Amino acid sequence: MPNDEAFSKPSTPSEAPHAPGVPPQGRAGGFGKASGALVGAASGSSAGGSSRGGGSGSGASDLGAGSKKSPRLPKCARCRNHGYASPLKGHKRFCMWRDCQCKKCNLIAERQRVMAAQVALRRQQAQEEELGISHPIPLPSAAELLVKRENNGSNPCLMTECSGTSQPPPASVPTTAASEGRMVIQDIPAVTSRGHVENTPDLVSDSTYYSSFYQPSLFPYYNNLYNCPQYSMALAADSASGEVGNPLGGSPVKNSLRGLPGPYVPGQTGNQWQMKNMENRHAMSSQYRMHSYYPPPSYLGQSVPQFFTFEDAPSYPEARASVFSPPSSQDSGLVSLSSSSPISNKSTKAVLECEPASEPSSFTVTPVIEEDE
């Protein structure tokens, strides 16, 4: 059809679809702008033209004059590579060479990808500048990682720069990058920021840093993480009852010693404590019988070890004989916890026999037994 060819290709005077003597069609000016102008000029110069032909010729000449100002229509590049000129609008899905893998079409596809990436990058930078997130910065060299160094001169903390010249970044970069919020790798926390190590170049396993998680408590009675409290609540209960009203006349400290667990009984040394055998220390499983990782608490002497065994205390033969004398007490800690109730048995008597005989005037066994009875 001549009108379609005129729409797809710009017609030249040698390719005019109509002869000069042929009367024009009324719709010729609506399809092709150049062909309509030629048809209008031919109809105006023809002798047998009517007034309708002259009117259409003048309208087509107006369209031809307006065509110079209109923007050009983009053409399909793939069709152009293969010798065809097709307008690009609405043509992408119907292009016969959209899946072509020839050299020219591959080059076109690669250029399209690059242009799309550049457009997206410019759009993102414009949005970030409008929001005030970032500012345009010069890109680093090809193989250089922008890792800030500690104190601008020490060795890098976790990563090393991959550049061949290994030039340190300028001194203004670490200070201004963090303030301006640039999209760079943030500061790696320095080892010196922990407050206990000075000028360490690399990350090392510090015993002082990890031991700060396991600091001993402020109360020396609970010095072990895995140990039960060494002093039970019966001590406070008995000491309070002994201080309020004590018919025995003895010291309340001595009377409150009945509330101590079985392993801790007073020896002849006064404030120091001796332990019974390790098996009867606590009625618990073996996983809690762990030695403390910390030095002995403050209530023990400097030269006194934390745990006593049979071999550790050779200088107390009398006290050791009296401490380990009761054979029937499986765990005297249970007896000491319930010592506030009126119970009279061999275990309580055995615990009371463990009191030192060096102070007979201040405390005796007989009044306690009579009170229990």
UniProtKB/Swiss-Prot annotation:
Residues that span the membrane, as ranges: none
Domain of life assignment: Eukaryota
Keywords for the protein's UniProt record, in alphabetical order: Developmental protein, Differentiation, DNA-binding, Metal-binding, Nucleus, Phosphoprotein, Sexual differentiation, Transcription, Transcription regulation, Zinc
Major place of residence: nucleus
Region feature (Disordered): 1-72, 319-373
InterPro entries: DM_DNA-bd (IPR001275), DM_DNA-bd_sf (IPR036407), DMRT (IPR026607), DMRT1-like (IPR022114)
Protein function: Transcription factor that plays a key role in male sex determination and differentiation by controlling testis development and male germ cell proliferation. Plays a central role in spermatogonia by inhibiting meiosis in undifferentiated spermatogonia and promoting mitosis, leading to spermatogonial development and allowing abundant and continuous production of sperm.
Family: Belongs to the DMRT family.
DNA-binding feature ranges: 72-118
Name of the protein in question: Doublesex- and mab-3-related transcription factor 1
